[in-house]
Amino acid sequence: MEPAIVLSISMAAVVVAITGISIYTSFGPPSKELNDPFDDHED
């Protein structure tokens, strides 16, 4: 395989992995640990 194809596939895999991790963090079990700054602020 040409180096450009390997690099393109590798970069695409990294982008998909980062997207998956961010979705898991936002909506999965770790989202319970996230806090909302608007809820923390009292007027």
From Swiss-Prot:
Keywords: Membrane, Thylakoid, Transmembrane, Transmembrane helix
Name under which the protein is recorded: Protein PsbN
Location of this chain's protein in the cell: Cellular thylakoid membrane
Gene assigned in the entry: psbN
NCBIfam families reported in the protein's UniProt record: PRK13183.1 (NF009650)
Organism: Nostoc punctiforme (strain ATCC 29133 / PCC 73102)
PANTHER family (UniProt xref): PROTEIN PSBN
Function: May play a role in photosystem I and II biogenesis.
GO annotation, biological process: photosynthesis
GO annotation, cellular component aspect: plasma membrane-derived thylakoid membrane
UniProt KW Thylakoid keyword: yes
